[in-house]
Amino acid sequence: MIALKATEMQHNNNALQQQQQLQHQLLQQHQQQHQQQLQQQLNSPDNNYIWATTHNANISRNNAMLQLQQQQLRAPWITDCNKQHHINNNNSMNVNYNQQLTQQPQQQQQQTQYMQHNYNNYTQQQQQQHLVPATTSQSNSHFYQCNQQQQQQQFLAPTTTTAAVVVAAAHQQHQTQQQHQSQQQQQHQRQDYASLQMGRQLGNFETGQSVLTLTTPTLTPTTTRNIEDTLGHLLSDTQTDRVAGCAGFAVPKVLPNAIDVLGMGIPTGVSSLPLQQTFDLSLGQGSESEDSNASYNDTQMNEEQDTTDTSSAHTDSTSYQAGHIMAGSVNGGGVNNFSNVLAAVSSSRGSASVGSSNANTSNTPARRGGGRRPNRSTNMTPEEEQKRAVRRERNKQAAARCRKRRVDQTNELTEEVEQLEKRGESMRKEIEVLTNSKNQLEYLLATHRATCQKIRSDMLSVVTCNGLIAPAGLLSAGSSGSGASSHHNHNSNDSSNGTITGMDATLNSTGRSNSPLDLKPAANIDSLLMHIKDEPLDGAIDSGSSLDQDGPPPSKRITLPPMSTMPHVHLSTILTPTGASSGSLQTPITSTAPGGFGSAFPVTSNGSSINNINSIGNNMNSPTLNAHNKVPKERPNTLAFQRPLGQMHLTMANNKAGGPTQIQGVPIQTPSTGTFNFDSLMDGGTGLTPVSGPLVPNSSSTNKHPLELPTPTAEPSKLVSL
């Protein structure tokens, strides 16, 4: 109340200042009029009135200064009267304030009229008094003096008029500054009045944001800040998401029409300030049942907030209307008469939750948060107190259960997180171990691949001859020879299928390894071969088989007729060695069974060589040696080629040393195994055979053991293409 009175007194002082400003404005208008008149008189050709007008202007300025001094002396007396008036009328403060607001314009008008009337009378009198000497001075007796005075006034007139203009301009600037200050003061007064009115309206409304003390005599910075915070929270609609979804409570929208409620206009002639706005604080599904956590109402505000329940302590489930607070109804007297206003608001509230049997309709004022709430309210029945105690105990238990449940859930989640972290760490370690093992295995595989390739190449070097395992040294010896020995690759003509088969003498030309097998032949191989039983040749055994199936298939082999069908071909003529000069046939052909090692044995004479070849060929087909042949077949290296029998003529030369051997008139000058290579026949290919010097047998090469024959690398050889 003291704050209200202080603001009203300030308002009265401001009104007095406004009156003074109006008086200053009137004086300014009069001064401007006089200045205009002076300028007109100075510009006129008649100079007789110069002295009178300047004198009148000076008199008018003096009168204005006197009036201002009188007003300044009168202002303190008016303020003292107003203070005494407000002190004597504390109970009817609002009425007097409103009456004074209505009476102030009337008083101002009366004062301004009175002052203006007096001022006009005074100025008229002064003008009359000063114009008389100006008129009487115009006589013939004082003509010379008048002329002198007129001349002096003419010289002094510009100076006096310029000084008057400068003074008037300075006075106008001072007046504009005063007007600007007065406008700022009026704005501050409006703001103070608006804040005061909002404080009246919000003094009975609970928002839980600030606390208005009951003993504050004036508007302190703390209270103004609290009012601003309250307005900010009321105008912002961000409270709906604050505790949404907590224990079934929903925060209501507080003051949706707060802008309409807070009327910012200053009432001018109103004797009462009715507040008839409706504040809806109803919850969405609020009820007053005893079995619901949403049974908080305004009576719960009077208890101490000693629980940490999820519900908001300053919200309730009641919907009420703010009562009509009449400004003249506060008649209790005294300074801190604030309980009457609260009682008026609480008495006009609506019933909480219509249709509920357990609704609390207490008229206790709800505090706005902060501080310790009273233990009991004034209008509380014993039943309501008991219900409140039961509800309070139940809320405490529910809050404790909620806290315990929240702690348990947090602990469970923490343990689960720790377990997952441990599991992830173990999985990372396992991944590292597996990665290391994978790298080691890859390294071992990379280092072992070269060894595997070498072993495979060594295994592929194993060859067979007529189904028998033959050493690589014998094959290499059979495909090449030195200059002092002749090597006859013994081929067989299979009469059952009509194909020429024999040992592969070109295996060494394919880039394979030439490391021989660890085969240790018997010491007396001649006596061992003599005991081998002769058996017929099995047509199913293919002498061209190998491990990797090299060469063309059997269907591409050259087919030659058997020697028995050829006319006039004698065995002795075929096996007769020829000289090197005639380019003789180096491949003997026989009609007997194929022999594996026939080409590896020395040739002493024609007859002995034939017997040796026949005996060896017959002995090589024994089942004793065939039983050791358990390896896969070798790739065929012969070409199955059908030729007409009529065109096949072997033209052999005489049994001379230099007679050439011809097939259909073409002399054969290169040694071969009796097998025509497919590539060499088609494209010329790579059918390269090592050729030595003159193939003339001597005694040094014929007496050697079969396994002691020279290898292809024994002597340098020549490569001749077909």
UniProtKB/Swiss-Prot annotation:
Provide the residue span(s) of the region labelled Basic motif: 387-406
Spell out the Low complexity composition-biased ranges: 173-188, 308-317, 350-364, 477-498
Instruction: List, alphabetically, the Pfam families matched.
Output: bZIP_1
Enumerate composition-biased segments (Polar residues).
Answer: 283-300, 506-516
What the entry lists under InterPro entries is as follows: AP-1, bZIP, bZIP_sf
Indicate the transmembrane segments per the record: none
Which protein is depicted? Transcription factor kayak, isoforms D/sro
Which species?
Drosophila melanogaster
